[in-house]
Amino acid sequence: MVSIYVPLIYITILMGSMYGVSRFVRKSKNQESKPVSEEWFGENYSRNIFFSLLQQNPPAEDTLLKAALVLRATEGLRRLMKLKVSRMALNNLLNRGGVGDELIRKFGRLEKETELELMDIAKTANSLQPGWNQFIFQTCNEIIENEKIHSIIDNIPKDIDSISQRWQTEKILYEAADEELRIQAQKELGVL
């Protein structure tokens, strides 16, 4: 004899599993709607700053908008350079069968997002000052190269300390080996 609790338990389990599946599907759809660039690179603060300046009331000065746009374009170029390097590694992994279709699809979406971002930057630059879209990326590339040079220069004092310490230890080892060879040569000559 089947009690009244069996169908109730069955319905409860069925409803709970349906709720779990629907929640999982909604969660995965929400993740896909989020920009892929935020997953890979994190939040784009320079873009957020530019749009907040653009929507300010009263409007921000042109020079401030241009500076924010240069920062946004610089960040876009940095991301593009990272993508180019990552594309080579991804192709290598793809040839070996080390990555799945999901990653390839996300990477393709990321490249499209970055291209659209750079095209939007070029259009915005042209709207701020006609013809500026031709020069903004050259300026941003120079900024990136300048930052690389500054990071190398900033690391020189750290490198000097490590090189100096290494040289001191090598100098002591060299002097000890030289002293040992000198003593051995004197023994062979009969001086000692």
UniProtKB/Swiss-Prot annotation:
**A single Pfam family, by name?**
Sec66
Membrane topology note: Single-pass type II membrane protein
**Protein name in the entry:** Translocation protein sec66
Q: How does it assemble?
A: Component of the heterotetrameric Sec62/63complex composed of sec62, sec63, sec66 and sec72. The Sec62/63 complex associates with the Sec61 complex to form the Sec complex.
Which sequence ranges are marked TM in the entry?
Answer: 4-21
Q: Which residues carry this modification: Phosphoserine?
A: 162
The gene it comes from is: sec66
Q: Where in the cell is it found?
A: Endoplasmic reticulum membrane
Q: What does this protein do?
A: Acts as a component of the Sec62/63 complex which is involved in SRP-independent post-translational translocation across the endoplasmic reticulum (ER) and functions together with the Sec61 complex and bip1 in a channel-forming translocon complex. A cycle of assembly and disassembly of Sec62/63 complex from sec61 may govern the activity of the translocon. sec66 is required to attach or retain sec72 in the sec63 complex.
Question: Which superkingdom?
Answer: Eukaryota
Lumenal topology: which positions? 1-3
* Keyword line: Endoplasmic reticulum, Membrane, Phosphoprotein, Protein transport, Signal-anchor, Transmembrane, Transmembrane helix, Transport
- Kindly state a single biological-process term from the GO annotations of this entry: post-translational protein targeting to membrane, translocation
The residue spans the entry assigns to the Cytoplasmic side of the membrane are as follows: 22-192
**A single GO CC term, please?**
Sec62/Sec63 complex
Q: Does the keyword DNA-binding apply?
A: no
Q: Which InterPro entries match?
A: Sec66
